[in-house]
Regions:
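Short hydrophobic "strand-cap" motifs at the C-terminus of beta-strands
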Residues: 24, 152, 194-195, 219, ...
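Short acidic active-site motifs
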Residues: 88-89, 226-229, 279-280
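Gly/Ser/Thr-rich phosphate-binding loop
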Residues: 212-214, 239-243, 253-322, 331
Length: 379
């Protein structure tokens, strides 16, 4: 494969009538999702925009995912703007991104109006019903290669100024294969997705789902304030795999929710993005003794993850979880302040190299150069 879209097309051919993405209002089968993405891609491609950044302003929904894939079909790359983002942050992102167009849902038009955006706006509700032009999409596809950017995720980092890490199709394909192989993601996998689509953890959920022919359920944010209802949804949808930030897992543990209700189908509990407290982890392990638990670690710049640790022993409350070993086809190492490799027990800064790496920060060569090192310094 050289393109993310090939993953979707392969799974849609195998499982056309199976659900791929479900939110609280919409259930989309693989066939429906593929058709919608191609329709949106056609509507964008008609404007002659190619290999440019396109912002997707949408609520967290199956429709947002269709718009993301639609941007890819148009031969461009996307940046997700969540409907709850403050307008000032979006303006700061747009200042760097300078999007060639915006795909926006009706519900998010009010946010778009606050941005003083004068470029092309594509209405999601209209675009999703635009008949797909297979000839146009075919011409676009002919010119796409695996090193083309797929998306840019913006992270503030330590400065508070948004930086857009650009990730290629090749990086996603390499990462998703590792993730799916390692955690045995397949057509029987049913994700319960907690993270926003502008956060790198969602890359694992979304793209491994279409790679393997699985199903992803978008959990409403409000349910984390009503944990018993959250359990009901997870059981009703037969969710068997979750990849959440630790603070979400801690809600269940701190309220001891699993003392009052069970999770009938969960087989894999993965977490990243924050430090997982071992006291709360021990609660989960006690309640789900046969589940796989794994601590994943990595910055946005490594697509999502560069190291992982499958929990294989008991930890005392307060004990630190290791970040584990490097992912396959990804190398991690520690450099000291003088630029030399740290030895066991020495401190330094963690670096990564491999196919998962982002292309750099969009429209920001200074930050890209500052975050990179010469290959000669590590070989």
């Amino acid at each position: 494969m050289k393109n993310i879209l090939e993953m979707l097309e392969y799974s849609a051919e195998r499982f056309p009538d199976k659900y791929v993405f479900r939110d609280e209002n919409t259930d989309m089968t693989y066939a429906e999702f593929l058709r919608t993405a191609k329709n949106i891609g056609t509507d964008i491609a008609k404007h002659g925009i190619n290999n440019k950044p396109i912002a997707v302003i949408a609520e967290r929904s199956a429709g947002c995912l269709a718009a993301m894939f639609g941007v890819l079909y148009s031969g461009n790359f996307y940046t997700v703007i969540d409907s709850e983002m403050p307008p000032e942050r979006v303006k700061a992102i747009f200042e760097t991104l300078k999007p060639a167009a915006v795909v926006v849902t009706k519900a998010c038009l009010s946010l778009l109006k606050k941005l003083d955006f004068n470029g092309k706006a594509v209405n999601y509700e209209t675009a999703k019903d635009c008949p797909a032009d297979s000839n146009l999409l075919g011409k676009v596809r002919e010119n796409m290669i695996d090193s083309d950017p797929a998306y840019a995720l913006f992270t503030s980092g330590s400065t508070g100024v948004p930086k857009g890490a650009v990730v290629s199709h090749k990086a996603v394909l390499s990462y998703v294969k590792w993730y799916s192989d390692t955690f045995k993601i397949d057509e029987n996998t049913v994700f319960g997705s907690q993270t926003p689509f502008y956060f790198s953890m969602s890359v694992s959920d979304v793209f491994s789902t279409v790679y393997a022919g699985g199903e992803l359920n978008i959990i409403p944010k409000t349910l984390f304030s009503f944990p018993m209802k959250l359990l009901e949804l997870l059981n009703e949808r037969r969710v068997n795999t979750i990849y959440w930030v630790p603070s979400a897992l801690c809600i269940i543990a701190n309220w001891r929710v699993l003392d009052y209700g069970e999770l009938k189908y969960i087989k894999k509990v993965l977490f990243a993005g924050e430090v997982m407290p071992t006291r709360q982890l021990n609660y989960w392990i006690e309640k789900l003794p046969y589940a796989l638990f794994a601590n994943l670690f990595g910055p946005t710049e490594t697509t999502d993850i560069c190291t992982y640790y499958i929990v294989d022993r008991k930890f005392k409350d307060g004990e630190t979880l290791p970040i584990g070993r490097a992912c396959d086809n990804c190398d991690v190492f520690v450099l000291k302040e003088d630029g030399t490799k740290a030895k066991t027990g020495e401190e330094g800064e963690l670096y990564a190299r491999g196919s998962f790496l982002a292309m750099g920060y969009y429209n920001n060569p200074e930050k890209t150069a500052a975050a990179s090192i010469s290959p000669s310094s590590i070989l």
